[in-house]
Amino acid sequence: MALTLPSDADEWIEAWGEKLNESDEYSEVGEGWGVDFNGDFLFHIRPDDTYDGEDLYFFVGLEDGVCTDAFRTDDPDGVDWGFAFRGEYSTWKRLIRQDLGAIDGLMSGEFELDGDMQRTLQYSDAAVVMTEEAAAVDTEFEY
């Protein structure tokens, strides 16, 4: 059964976290991420011309190839993240559909990163697998 974004946001982010933990490839390419530094992510989906609802925030705990937590939050300042990845709804839609890569979107300015860009680029293979696993969640979009 497909999960619909944004109305099924809670279930969707939990499903993505499960996909990451089921992925041997993510376990391998994410090895070392978040070790001796805060590798947790805040993913921020902003309204745009396609979606005029509320901002969506997902917290994803990542450490050494494991997703330690994955949930939607209404309080982005209430979670301890080391990196934030921000973009508009339509851009996230393209990412989840694999029409845009995470690193390509970042380099083109379609996504913004708060955090250590150099470290993120060192783990670009993990970003690719994370995007593939997001695409593996059966997703429909309301807008």
Q: What are these regions, as identified by a protein language model?
A:
Residues 1-143:
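Feature captures hydrophobic
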